[in-house]
Structure formats: structure tokens, C-alpha cells
């Protein structure tokens, strides 16, 4: 079975899709655990990694390439973790960190802005205007981050194998569609893929420590 990445905008219910999908397939479901693993592997304070991957790049980041260093730690930890296969990863930028991994199934989950606003209102008990501002800020930071490090927009559908919109489609519908795709030969973790994964992980580890 494959390695699956779930990318989503904030408050788009991608976490729920990932967790249900992992249960359906019998996969590991991982997210922020990778930050902790990177922190332990490279002896970097966890809070520094969190800021590096969640905050939009500052002027200093653009000059010193500070974010690149922290992202290298996370990428190395993630590549090491997914070598076992049978993983659903819904954390930070999986579709980008694993873009060189053959056969990884990259999924994008979308939701209508009205549904996202109501999700924030319900979860955080704020007004609709405040919810809209929070979503806009989060989306803007993700766009800036992706462009700074990879020169891509997370909304570019060419980055993904599957793009699904929650709303017209239920969570169970989305899980079913992804599970069906996950069984296709193109997305299986073959011995050749495992060899490539090991090589990528070794290279990423060396780059992170350099």
C-alpha cells in the first residue's frame, strides 16, 4: 500500500479525512509527530521548528535562508519515517517534502469558504468576520511560505494527484475515493520505491547535518 499525503487549507476538514482514511486502510496517520522526531534527531528546539514551518517568511529568512535549514530537518525526519510505507501524512507540506518520492499519492482537500467560516465560528467561538480574517491570514501565510521555499502556490492543482472538495462530497465519499486510488498499481510502495526512499532519506539526512 502507498504513502499518502493530505494537503488542505485551514479549517477544510482535511485532518478528519486523513484520520478516517488511515483507519479504512489500516495505515499509520501522522502529522505533527514529525516535528517532534526532527527535534529529537537533530537536537533542535521544537518551538523553533514550529515557527519555521508555520510562519510566513520574514525579510531575515529571505536573506539568511533560515527557513530552509529548519525545513531540511523536518524533511529528513519525514523521509526516514515513511520508509516503512502504509502512511497517511496530513502534516506540514507533505506534497512538497515528498515530491521526489515515486508513487506517493498526493491529495488536496478543499472546502467552500462558507463552510470554513462556520467551522472556525463553531470551533473558536468568534464572529464570522473574525473567522474570515483568520482564514485569510492562514491561507496567505501558506502561500508565502510555499512560494518562498518552492516557488509554487499551494492552490496549483498540478501539484496533486487528486483534488477533492468537501461540501458537495461528504467525508466518507472523499475517503472512499482516495482509498480506491490508493489501491492502483501506480501508487504502490514497491521494492524499487523503497530503495529510492532509502537513498532520498540518506541524502536528506546528510544535507540537514551539513
What are these regions (language model features)?
Residues 5-21:
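Glycine-rich phosphate-binding P-loop
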Residues 180-210:
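N-terminal targeting leaders
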Residues 100-123, 128-137:
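Conserved phosphate-donor/acceptor-positioning beta-strand/loop module used by diverse small-molecule
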Residues 128-172, 200, 207:
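Small-molecule kinase domains that catalyze NTP-dependent phosphoryl transfer to phosphate-bearing small molecules
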Residues 75, 171-175, 179:
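Short, amphipathic alpha-helical "lid/cap" segments that border enzyme active or binding sites
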Residues 94-95, 111-117, 168-170:
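Conserved nucleotide-binding/hydrolysis micro-motifs of P-loop NTPases
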Residues 35-86, 93, 126:
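ATP-dependent small-molecule kinase phosphotransfer cores
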Amino acid at each position: 500500500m502507498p504513502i499518502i499525503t493530505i494537503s488542505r487549507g485551514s479549517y477544510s476538514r482535511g485532518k478528519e479525512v486523513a484520520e478516517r482514511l488511515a483507519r479504512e486502510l489500516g495505515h499509520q496517520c501522522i502529522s505533527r509527530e514529525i516535528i517532534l522526531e526532527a527535534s529529537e534527531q537533530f537536537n533542535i528546539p521544537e518551538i523553533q521548528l514550529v515557527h519555521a514551518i508555520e510562519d510566513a517568511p520574514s525579510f531575515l529568512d529571505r536573506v539568511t535562508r533560515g527557513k530552509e535549514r529548519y525545513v531540511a530537518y523536518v524533511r529528513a525526519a519525514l523521509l526516514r519515517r515513511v520508509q516503512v510505507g502504509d502512511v497517511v501524512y496530513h502534516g506540514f507540506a507533505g506534497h512538497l517534502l515528498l515530491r521526489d518520492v515515486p508513487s506517493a499519492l498526493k491529495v488536496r482537500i478543499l472546502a467552500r469558504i462558507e463552510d470554513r467560516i462556520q467551522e472556525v465560528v463553531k470551533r473558536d467561538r468568534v464572529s464570522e468576520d473574525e473567522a474570515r480574517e483568520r482564514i485569510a491570514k492562514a491561507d496567505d501565510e501558506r502561500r508565502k511560505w510555499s512560494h518562498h521555499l518552492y516557488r509554487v502556490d499551494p492552490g496549483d492543482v498540478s501539484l496533486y494527484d487528486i483534488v477533492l472538495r468537501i461540501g458537495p462530497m461528504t467525508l466518507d465519499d472523499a475517503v472512499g475515493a482516495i482509498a480506491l486510488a490508493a489501491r492502483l498499481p501506480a501508487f504502490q510502495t514497491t521494492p524499487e520505491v523503497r530503495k529510492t526512499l532509502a537513498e532520498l532519506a540518506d541524502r536528506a539526512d546528510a544535507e540537514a547535518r551539513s
